Design a protein with these regions (language model features):
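Catalytic cores of nucleotide-sugar-dependent glycosyltransferases that transfer UDP/GDP/TDP-activated
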Residues: 1-191
Length: 191
């Protein structure tokens, strides 16, 4: 996008996707020239709060900013969620959009999924409990169809709400509740 001023690139449109606004690519300004070879006249685009901020530069230079959902696109305009980039995003206005990402409903259809113990559909929901009981066995839990089983698949980082889960964990974990978590991420959660 630094080449937008060159006539042959004038009509090229660009988009930047934000998956997680917390990971902004922040470094000391000294690497702009020393490592990246970026000339000093372009520093104002790169610099934010005294450091090189690659996400800020990308947001400023692209035509459209995309996020993983419409609600996330709205959230990151708020100072609470933006990790300091709300003024830059707000300047983009309606050129910050969200396109919902999600699962492939054909590949993840419980009526045809070869990866589950018992196939089921909306008319045979009672078969679903076989999967619950088998998962409980696989996880070393006492199989009990009356026991609530909470499952969570996530990247194990604060941004995904693990700090909130940890905060309320003892309140939601009663005598008749089991919790299964699958993911990787920050060592404090993995351990």
């Amino acid at each position: 996008t630094f080449y937008r001023g060159i006539p042959k690139f004038h009509d090229i449109r660009t988009m930047f996707t934000i998956h997680n606004i917390q990971y902004q690519g922040q470094y000391g300004m000294e690497i702009a020239w020393d490592v990246l070879g970026i000339p000093e006249y372009q520093y104002p685009v790169l610099e934010y709060n005294g450091c090189l901020n690659m996400m800020k530069a990308a947001i400023m230079q692209v035509n459209v900013v995309n996020t993983v959902s419409p609600s996330y696109a709205m959230e990151i305009h708020d100072p609470w969620y933006s990790h300091g980039l709300d003024p830059i995003l707000n300047a983009k206005g309606d050129r910050v959009i969200g396109i919902l990402n999600g699962i492939d409903v054909e590949a993840n259809n419980p009526a045809t999924d070869e990866g589950i113990y018992q196939k089921y559909d909306v008319k045979t929901l009672e078969k679903k409990k076989v999967n619950k009981l088998e998962l409980m066995k696989e996880m070393g839990l006492e199989p009990d169809e009356n026991r609530m089983l909470i499952g969570m698949v996530s990247r194990l980082v604060d941004h995904k709400g693990l700090d909130l889960v940890r905060y309320i964990f003892h309140d939601i974990m009663g005598d008749n509740v089991s919790f299964v978590l699958l993911g990787s991420g920050d060592a404090e959660y993995e351990n």
